Amino acid sequence: MFRILYLFVLCGAVSASIFNFMHDQYQHQEPRHEVSFEQRVLESNCDKYLCPGTLECVARPQDCPCPYPSSQMRCVLPNGDPLCISKPTGDYNGKYDDPAKNWKVDAKDDNVRDCGWVKRAWEGRV
């Protein structure tokens, strides 16, 4: 009985020691001096429109790219506002990969969430 109790106490002490060691490893890292988002906006030399999600300088808000172009596509709502959505998953032979053309694709299938689906949803047809 005492052996089992001793084993539990020993295991607890070892795990606490390992936890403290790991905790100390993270405490002694040098702090990173990252420039804040606000600072990057203020230091921007953009004389046109500065996209809020990517800090790209473009002519108008409708030209803002999506923050994650490999997994998102930009759709333009009927009122002209841009909207980034996740690209449809599945085997679509890369037709959603080109940002210059993917917003034109409409699978005409309400199970495929592409820009055509967004337009139909905007119009209340979904």
Swiss-Prot record:
Domain of life from the UniProt record: Eukaryota
InterPro entries: LCL2
Swiss-Prot/TrEMBL keywords: Signal
UniProt KW Signal keyword: yes
Stretch forming the signal peptide: 1-16
Example of a GO biological process term: ERAD pathway
Record carries keyword Transmembrane helix: no
Protein family according to the UniProt entry: Belongs to the LCL2 family.
Record function comment: Probable component of the endoplasmic reticulum-associated degradation (ERAD) pathway.
The name this protein goes by in its record: Long chronological lifespan protein 2
Organism: Clavispora lusitaniae (strain ATCC 42720) (Yeast)
Gene responsible for this protein: LCL2
